[in-house]
């Protein structure tokens, strides 16, 4: 294993990135300055030397920022990242092609070395946390007890959502025979309000949605094509691979390639129980919902298999599955880079998902509609509303959520850092 150090060198909200020379391994990719720890050196000594050789500066090495291991095909790297301050000199590209002081947003647009992606993610997490704490902010989740198509539009308007360009509206088309899914007539006003295309993906297991031909017939039968343009994102191969270098379980996610045709996404979720995930909401729509049929196998297996024929033979341990869903959801959130909005409707509250041909009837009375720009917060709020309910059927729903460790998906998503479990519930 190769011991490597890197430096997080800041100037206000910006930090220094270096572009590797074209002729070197991973040429033209951007990275944090640093290098190998030589025999006899401490990590701090190595970092001081590397900054002197690479950048022509003297630094004061501060606290440890992050420690990680990254496996390249040719070598495994153990990387320790330190914060540091400039003591003297101005950074120069002595061993790099170029240097650039960037914000986290600007860094996210650059091609980063794979081992450096987790460093950027940690910077983003801390910046978001610090900003929210500094302003006493929590993620806003809007809530209404009135469940109507018109109210859905009102909830979306409350978000002032950044849905620009070509908008995808992710729905659940409903398995054939399922009586609980939300019909296209319910979603029609909000989809039309943003001029969206309804998008879906094929399933991995047998049913009416596991091939493009069958799924298209079902979409027509359920009325989706009557009202909207509809796009099966994985109708044609190859899938689009979204990298997850810092994933808890997955290192990549496989989504329908046509997701590339959209600039933003409106995620429309029917909150309910789920036989495998404990519950289904925004995080499930982002993960399993946006995954291609092979991508669904990949998530359910915890990154072991994409073989649809052996789907049920490769089911991951439950916590790994929940973490894989969180990994996959985070990759889609990062892909759209903030251009997303989430609506969860808590009606037809069965313990079973809309993917079940034979689903239990609702066990609880309807609760309401929630809206947020934070997929973690909106799912946490739905869970909290279930637990706070005095409905006699609450126990059945809670048992389903807890027996499948459903909240662990939310915990994992918050740990990854693309949303927060802390929220402010604003009732409209």
Q: Model regions: which residues?
A:
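Conserved Nudix-box catalytic region and its N-terminal flanking loop in Nudix hydrolases
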Residues: 14-53, 57
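Active-site-adjacent beta-strand/loop module that shapes the phosphate/pyrophosphate-binding cleft
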Residues: 11, 58-60, 66-92, 98-104, ...
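Extended, low-polarity segments enriched in aliphatic/aromatic residues
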Residues: 136-189, 193-428
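Conserved hydrophobic/aromatic beta-strand scaffold that supports enzyme active sites
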Residues: 17, 81-83, 99-101, 285, ...
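Conserved N-terminal beta-strand and adjoining loop/helix that marks the start
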Residues: 1-15, 36
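Charged phosphate-binding loop/patch that engages nucleotide di/tri-phosphates or the phosphate backbone
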Residues: 115-131
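Hydrophobic packing within well-folded, soluble alpha/beta domains
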Residues: 7, 43, 47-51, 64, ...
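Short glycine/proline-enriched coil/turn segments at helix->beta-strand junctions
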Residues: 11-13, 60, 87, 163-165, ...
């Amino acid at each position: 294993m190769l011991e490597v150090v890197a430096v997080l060198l800041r100037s206000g909200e910006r930090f220094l990135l270096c572009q590797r020379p074209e002729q070197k391994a991973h040429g033209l990719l951007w990275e944090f300055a640093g290098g190998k720890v030589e025999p006899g050196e401490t990590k701090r000594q190595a970092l001081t030397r590397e900054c002197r050789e690479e950048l022509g500066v003297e630094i004061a090495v501060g606290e440890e920022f992050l420690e990680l291991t990254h496996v390249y095909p040719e070598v495994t790297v153990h990387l320790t990242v330190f914060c540091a301050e400039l003591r003297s000199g101005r950074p120069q590209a002595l061993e790099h092609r170029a240097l650039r002081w960037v914000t986290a947003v600007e860094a996210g647009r650059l091609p980063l070395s794979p081992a450096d992606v987790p460093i950027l993610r940690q910077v983003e997490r801390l910046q978001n946390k610090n900003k929210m704490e500094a302003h006493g902010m929590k993620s806003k989740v809007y809530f209404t007890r009135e469940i109507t198509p018109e109210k859905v539009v009102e909830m979306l308007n409350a978000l002032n959502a950044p849905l620009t360009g070509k908008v995808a509206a992710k729905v659940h088309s409903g398995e054939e025979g399922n009586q609980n899914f939300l019909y296209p007539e319910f979603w029609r006003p909000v989809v039309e309000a943003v001029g969206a295309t309804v998008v879906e993906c094929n399933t991995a297991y047998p049913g009416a949605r596991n091939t493009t031909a069958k799924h298209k017939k079902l979409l027509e039968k359920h009325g989706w094509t009557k009202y909207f343009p509809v796009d099966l994102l994985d109708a044609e191969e190859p899938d689009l691979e979204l990298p997850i270098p810092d994933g808890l379980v997955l290192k990549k996610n496989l989504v329908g390639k046509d997701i590339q045709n959209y600039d933003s996404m409106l995620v429309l979720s029917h909150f309910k129980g789920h036989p495998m995930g404990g519950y289904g909401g925004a995080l499930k729509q982002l993960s399993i919902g946006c995954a291609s049929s092979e991508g669904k196998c990949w998530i359910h297996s915890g990154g072991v298999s994409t073989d649809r024929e052996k789907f049920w033979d490769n089911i991951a341990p439950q916590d790994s599955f929940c973490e894989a869903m969180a990994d996959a959801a985070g990759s889609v959130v990062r892909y759209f880079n903030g251009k997303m909005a989430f609506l969860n409707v808590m009606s037809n509250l069965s313990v079973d998902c809309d993917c079940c041909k034979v689903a239990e009837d609702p066990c609880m009375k309807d609760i309401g509609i929630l809206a947020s720009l934070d997929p973690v917060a909106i799912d946490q709020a739905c869970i909290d509303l279930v637990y706070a309910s005095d409905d006699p059927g609450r126990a059945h729903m809670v048992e389903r959520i807890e027996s499948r460790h459903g909240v662990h998906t939310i915990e994992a998503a918050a740990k990854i850092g693309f949303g927060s479990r802390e929220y402010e519930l604003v009732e409209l």
